[in-house]
Each structure stands twice: as structure tokens, then as C-alpha cells.
């Protein structure tokens, strides 16, 4: 029989990328119902001894997330460093990275005159995991889901949350897809161990990561 169900993203989203662009981590997409409907689902699953695993996308958010809306208001906004903003170089992007979805991994913001990083679409700005306030906000959100009763998380592209220090160019001319600069970087395990301590330790839960570009020998 069924022992667990993994829900692909059901959070509030404008659906630019099938729900992997989250607008609100603590609201259910209207197409799927309400938070009360979610609580009913979770309760009925647990009555039947079925676990519920949520998809979690914390490499990036939607550009319609409240954090990003605040972040792009000004250079000194308290949420500015929740995302990765950089000055351009000679009127062009901060580096030559391409994204999974677009020729350049950077989009220009006219209002503040800086570029923001998005390893996927321009509708999915990357979160800045070097900012401890961002990490604390993510952990608090995860713990609220655990307190609600969810049994674990499947973590989308979690191996991409740490970028190479200084965001150096990839090797080659033009736009370059450079996973060696944004996948499985030195701080990745530091962040994941901190997450384990803050969210998973002491709980009867599970976690599985989509670890893009990571090989079995890299496991630690």
C-alpha cells in the first residue's frame, strides 16, 4: 500500500514554472484549495498512517514574492540582500553565466540600476544564502510547516544554493553555462548542516535533496 505522498509545489505561485516559482511559502495555490483544505488532507492522511512530504524550493522564489518586491525597491531596503544583486561590468552583466532557461543568468532592474541573479527564469530570482537573515527566514518557514504536521521535504535543486565566492566568470566566450561556479560550492554543506540543526534535529522526519551536478563520491 501507499506509505507516503510527495506533493509537488502546492504553494501560492503565479505559475511561471509549474509552481517552482513560489510567491508565498505559507499559502496554498488557489487551484488546490486553502490552508484549511491542506490541514484536512494532512489529518486524513495521518489517520491512514500515510506520511506527507512537501516539495521545497529555496534556491529561488518568485519575483512576486513579498521579499523580492521589497528587495527591488531601493539599494538600502532591508530585504535587498535576501537576493543576489550586483553592479554590471562596462554596461553589461556582472558575469557571463547563462541560466538553465535564459541566455543570461542576470536581469537588469531599471529602478535601482543593478542586476539580479536567476539560475532559472527572470521570474525566479535566486535567494542569497550568504545572508544569515535570509537563512533564518527560511528555517522559520520550514519549522512552521513541521509544526503543522508535515513529515518531510523534497528539496528542489538544493545543491545550487551556495555560489562561488565573487561569482567569477565561466570559462569561454559569450554566455557560458558554468555549474562549476554555482553547483556544489564550498559553503553548501555548511548551510545544510545548519539547516539540519535548526529544522531537522529532534524531529521524526525525512529529507531528500535534488542534488544537481553532485556525484555519489561527493556525499558527506
Language-model-derived ranges and their functions:
Residues 1-143, 147, 160-217:
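Acidic/aromatic-lined carbohydrate-recognition and catalytic surfaces
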Residues 5, 153-155:
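Hydrophobic residues within beta-strands of alpha/beta enzymes
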Residues 148-152:
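A glycine-centered loop/beta-turn motif at secondary-structure junctions
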Residues 220:
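Short, aromatic/basic amphipathic alpha-helical patches
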Amino acid at each position: 500500500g501507499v506509505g507516503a505522498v510527495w506533493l509537488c509545489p502546492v504553494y501560492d505561485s503565479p505559475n511561471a514554472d509549474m509552481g517552482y516559482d513560489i510567491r508565498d511559502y505559507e499559502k496554498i495555490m488557489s487551484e488546490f484549495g486553502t490552508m484549511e483544505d491542506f490541514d484536512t488532507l494532512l489529518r486524513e492522511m495521518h489517520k491512514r498512517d500515510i506520511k506527507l512530504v512537501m516539495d521545497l524550493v529555496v534556491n529561488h522564489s518568485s519575483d512576486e514574492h513579498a521579499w523580492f518586491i521589497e528587495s527591488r525597491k531601493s539599494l538600502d531596503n532591508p530585504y535587498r540582500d535576501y537576493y543576489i544583486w550586483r553592479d554590471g561590468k562596462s554596461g553589461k552583466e556582472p558575469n557571463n553565466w547563462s541560466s538553465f532557461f535564459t541566455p543570461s543568468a542576470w536581469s537588469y532592474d531599471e529602478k535601482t540600476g543593478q542586476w539580479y541573479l536567476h539560475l532559472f527564469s527572470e521570474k525566479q530570482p535566486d535567494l542569497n544564502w550568504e545572508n544569515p537573515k535570509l537563512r533564518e527566514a527560511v528555517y522559520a518557514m520550514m519549522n512552521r510547516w513541521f509544526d503543522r504536521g508535515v513529515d518531510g521535504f523534497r528539496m528542489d535543486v538544493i545543491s545550487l544554493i551556495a555560489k562561488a565566492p565573487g561569482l567569477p566568470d565561466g570559462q569561454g566566450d559569450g554566455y557560458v553555462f558554468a555549474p562549476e561556479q554555482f553547483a556544489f560550492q564550498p559553503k553548501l554543506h555548511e548551510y545544510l548542516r545548519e539547516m539540519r540543526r535548526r529544522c531537522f534535529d529532534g524531529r521524526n522526519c525525512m529529507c531528500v535533496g535534488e542534488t544537481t551536478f553532485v556525484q555519489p563520491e561527493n556525499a558527506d
